């Protein structure tokens, strides 16, 4: 252990605030979470560095709290733990918010004013003014988050912190991109991207409001021309194979439509679509409005030669596709609902599939939006996987999968259609700017489609620790799905692309292998400040080559010691982006021995059953948690409210329940007085039970089953103490031999109170870095040995007593007898020996007289490692008290035709 962990912490040197503030200051003052390289096994854990455009809330806190619990647990098992943290200051959100403040945008100013009030700032106007510089936003919230994390008791090594805006780190990112480029993974070309209209810039998941939990993807539509006499209509579809089932075209009477010149034609689309067409590289010219009445005056011819009319429908969304929809009632739920209202139920069926529209109508409530949405998904899925085309010209007989690509290809090649890109849902950036799909002719992107890279990614995923295991296949699927990914933008904060400095590397691409820099950020920064950090130096440090100076040597030593990351913990929404990029960039850059060793993927967080959002009024900030609820209660809530993979619901009902048990624990500790006198049988049982619980706790924690671990070691031990007290045991005497290990076990979740009680009752070292004695089991075995049992036997003995007691109560309930006395006869030595021989199929002559009984009752035989008579005799008073009459314990064999079996005594009530 580092000497820092053993240093005495006198109370006079600690700021006398409340328990949590006191120990936060003490830990920080003595730097106990700043590890040094030593001979112990190392453990490096990372969680995503926070984005610094605002305060964090209870949902964010779950990930960081789980990471800290694991880091603290590993320290308790004598690992040399590195739990570092930095800050993500790249991308467009910070810049966009700053620009909105400069422009005097009231909603943005109000938002940041609310943040500053929460942090208790006085000169808010001056701070808002300073936020016109985006760097000031990033730096302010970086510092605020440090304080939030300290208030929650996170055991982070802050000496290694850096940001994605730090110039030495940007040198590292440029080195990374040069290596990716050398491997043929960085490319430039025409590519569709998510784009912010107001910011005039590409955006990614990190830039989009709710982009991490409600994904926005790019969908490829087929925009089809329908020829008219004066002008054409363009309708975009994800299902071009349905073109042979068209009955009509829908337009929305409340939408503004415009005529555009495109591909040598005059065509009509919604005004919103005309903007999107421009950004997708189409040469168009808007030639004026087209009224709905004008559109409906003429008929239109499909590419298959069918003439159709235009009808009005208010479900048509002007901001989705072209704002014009061609109707296929047999194969579109919305078309079906609207068409039958206007024209009845006579329409062609051009896809044969197990599920028909009549099945959909009986299964779902098509009068509701929710019903139509669910029905649409079900129908599309069924037809895609099982459908075949009929009455569809040359495509008849094809599967839907085959026909979709064939029809699209033929329509485009004949000039009757073109590709149009649309977002999978309406989206805005974090600063409120509308997001569309744009096609840039010179976009830089990372090519994740390379087979060799995917093979390496799969190898990494299939050989690492994965919790929960179910996500291994999900991660492999995400790797398979990933193709080209835009990696740079024209504007925003971040690192300049090294081979084209007009572009800034986007915020998901500059934060893939950054955990490597945690290992040696201090010497790397020193190298940069002395002008010695170039690509060659970075290669020598992170790859091959002899270091050329002391800073390089130190940087390489630390990297070699700490890397790879042993556990990366993040939330499920990051699988398709952060985690996939993390895996593939490590695979591309580093040798296998430096690949991440493990991933833990946590579930989502809701508040009172609803998604966390300001509009719902259920946002609880990390600062508010520490002030209002206490850090340790929040940490305990995170640990026990849900297992890692499940959704955690932050709600007052569960919080109140957890708080009550926590207060019970505090009352227990406040009244504790050490007592080293001899233990009674019941108190020895508690020690034995604790020994078993502690072993189970460690097994659960080693599997990252945090909820199970703390239900056991926190609630379970409290319940055991209640039971002990009901048996007349002395809680103080029972706790004395286990209190140190109990506080060590509780420390990862309630570190402040564990530290307080540790210093009060155990030692002047820090429990946060005072590990378990790996031979703790021997110590507890010695404690209970004087009762002639092992810990497991002692634990089983009390369960046996309760089982016998329950058998007595069951007999009383069935017979209705109010007992005056109870006689319990346990198997004597002859029966026990006979039962052992019977179970081993080696019956001696002396034992044969019991065989007729044993053969009938084989399933009831339970041979314990303790003397049943002795155990029941020790608990005779307890049994008498519980039953309400005298209890006598005897040894015997056959009583009134019933045999006393091992584990199943004969009970006689009178």
Curated annotation (Swiss-Prot):
Q: Under which main EC class is this enzyme filed?
A: ligase
- Cite the PROSITE patterns for this sequence: AA_TRNA_LIGASE_I (PS00178)
Protein name as annotated: Leucine--tRNA ligase
Q: What is its EC number?
A: 6.1.1.4
Motif 'HIGH' region: which residue numbers? 50-60
Q: Residues that bind ATP, according to the entry?
A: 614
- Coiled-coil stretches: none
Keyword Secreted applies: no
Q: Which GO terms fall under molecular function for this chain's record?
A: aminoacyl-tRNA deacylase activity; ATP binding; leucine-tRNA ligase activity
Give the domain of life: Archaea
């Amino acid at each position: 252990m580092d000497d820092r962990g053993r240093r005495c912490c006198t109370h006079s040197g600690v700021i006398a605030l409340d328990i949590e503030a006191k120990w936060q200051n003490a830990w920080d003052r003595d730097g106990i979470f700043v590890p040094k390289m030593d001979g112990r096994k190392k453990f490096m854990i990372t969680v995503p560095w926070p984005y610094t455009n605002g305060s964090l809330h209870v949902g964010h806190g779950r990930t960081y709290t789980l990471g800290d619990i694991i880091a603290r647990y590993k320290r308790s098992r004598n690992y040399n733990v590195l739990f570092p943290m930095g800050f993500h200051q790249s991308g467009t959100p910070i810049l966009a918010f700053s620009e909105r403040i400069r422009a005097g945008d009231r909603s943005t100013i109000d938002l940041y004013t609310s943040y500053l009030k929460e942090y208790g700032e006085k000169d808010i106007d001056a701070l808002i003014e300073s936020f016109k510089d985006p760097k000031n936003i990033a730096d302010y919230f970086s510092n605020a988050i440090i304080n939030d994390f300290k208030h929650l008791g996170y055991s982070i090594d802050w000496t290694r912190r850096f940001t994605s805006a730090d110039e030495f780190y940007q040198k590292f990112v440029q080195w990374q991109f040069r290596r990716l480029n050398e491997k043929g993974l960085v490319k430039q070309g025409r590519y569709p991207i998510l784009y912010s209209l107001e910011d005039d810039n590409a955006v990614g998941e990190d830039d989009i409001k709710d982009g991490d939990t409600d994904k926005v993807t790019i969908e490829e539509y087929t925009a089809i021309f329908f020829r008219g006499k004066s002008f054409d209509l363009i309708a975009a579809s994800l299902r071009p194979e349905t073109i042979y089932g068209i009955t009509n075209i829908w337009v929305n009477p409340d939408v503004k439509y415009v005529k555009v010149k495109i591909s040598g034609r005059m065509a009509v689309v919604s005004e919103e679509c005309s903007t999107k067409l421009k950004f997708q590289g189409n040469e168009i010219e808007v030639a004026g409005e087209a009224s709905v009445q004008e559109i409906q005056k003429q008929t239109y011819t499909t590419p298959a030669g069918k003439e159709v009319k235009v009808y009005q429908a208010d479900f048509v969304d002007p901001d989705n596709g072209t704002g014009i929809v061609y109707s296929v009632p047999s194969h579109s739920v919305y078309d079906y609902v609207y068409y039958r209202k206007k024209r009845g139920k006579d329409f062609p069926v051009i896809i044969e599939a197990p599920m028909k529209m009549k099945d959909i109508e009986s299964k779902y409530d098509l009068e509701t939006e929710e019903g139509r949405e669910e029905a649409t998904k079900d129908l599309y899925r069924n037809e895609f996987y099982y459908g075949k085309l009929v009455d569809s010209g040359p495509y008849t007989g094809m599967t839907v999968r085959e026909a979709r690509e064939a029809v699209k290809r033929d329509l485009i090649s004949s000039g009757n259609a073109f590709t149009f890109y649309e977002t999978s849902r309406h989206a805005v950036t974090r600063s409120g700017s509308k997001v569309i799909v744009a096609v840039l002719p010179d976009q830089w992107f990372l090519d994740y489609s390379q087979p060799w890279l995917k093979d390496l990614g799969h190898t990494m995923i299939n050989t690492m620790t994965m919790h929960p295991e179910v996500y291994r296949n999900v991660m492999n699927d995400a790797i398979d799905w990933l193709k080209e990914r835009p990696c740079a933008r024209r504007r925003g904060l971040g690192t300049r692309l090294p081979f084209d400095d007009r572009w800034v590397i986007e915020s998901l691409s500059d934060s893939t292998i950054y955990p490597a820099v945690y290992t040696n950020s201090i010497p790397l920064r020193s190298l940069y400040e002395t002008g010695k950090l170039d690509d060659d130096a970075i290669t020598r440090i992170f790859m091959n080559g002899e270091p050329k100076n002391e800073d390089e040597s130190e940087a390489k030593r630390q990297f070699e010691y700490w890397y790879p990351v042993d556990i990366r913990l993040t939330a499920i929404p990051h699988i398709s982006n952060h985690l996939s990029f993390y895996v593939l960039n490590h695979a591309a850059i580093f040798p296998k021995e430096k690949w991440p060793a493990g991933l833990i993927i946590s579930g989502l967080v809701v508040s009172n059953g609803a998604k966390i959002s300001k509009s719902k009024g259920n946002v609880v900030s990390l600062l508010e948690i520490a002030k209002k609820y206490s850090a340790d209660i929040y940490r305990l809530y995170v640990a026990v409210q849900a297992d890692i993979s499940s959704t955690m619901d932050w709600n007052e009902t569960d919080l109140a329940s957890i708080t009550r048990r926590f207060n019970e624990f505090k009352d227990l500790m406040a009244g504790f007085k050490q007592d080293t006198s001899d233990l009674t049988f019941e108190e020895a049982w508690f020690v034995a039970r604790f020994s078993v619980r502690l072993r189970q706790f460690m097994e659960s924690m080693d599997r990252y089953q945090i909820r199970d671990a703390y239900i056991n070691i926190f609630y379970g031990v409290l319940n055991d103490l209640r039971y002990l007290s009901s048996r007349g045991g002395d809680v103080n005497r029972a706790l004395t031999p286990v209190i140190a290990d109990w506080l060590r076990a509780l420390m990862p979740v309630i570190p402040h109170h564990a530290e307080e009680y540790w210093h009060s009752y155990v030692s002047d070292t820090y429990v946060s870095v005072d590990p378990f004695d790996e031979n703790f089991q021997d110590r507890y075995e010695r404690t209970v040995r004087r009762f002639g049992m092992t810990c497991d036997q002692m634990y089983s003995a009390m369960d046996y007593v309760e089982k016998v007691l329950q058998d007595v109560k069951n007999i009383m309930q069935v017979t209705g007898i109010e007992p005056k006395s109870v006689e319990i006869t346990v198997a004597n030595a002859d029966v026990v020996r006979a039962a052992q021989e019977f179970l081993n199929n080696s019956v001696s002559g002396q034992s044969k007289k019991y065989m007729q009984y044993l053969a009938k009752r084989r399933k009831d035989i339970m041979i314990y490692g303790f003397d049943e008579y002795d155990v029941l005799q020790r608990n005779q008073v307890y049994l008498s008290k519980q039953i309400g009459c005298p209890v006598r314990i005897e040894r015997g064999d056959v009583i009134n035709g019933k045999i006393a079996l091992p584990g199943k005594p004969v009970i006689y009530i009178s």
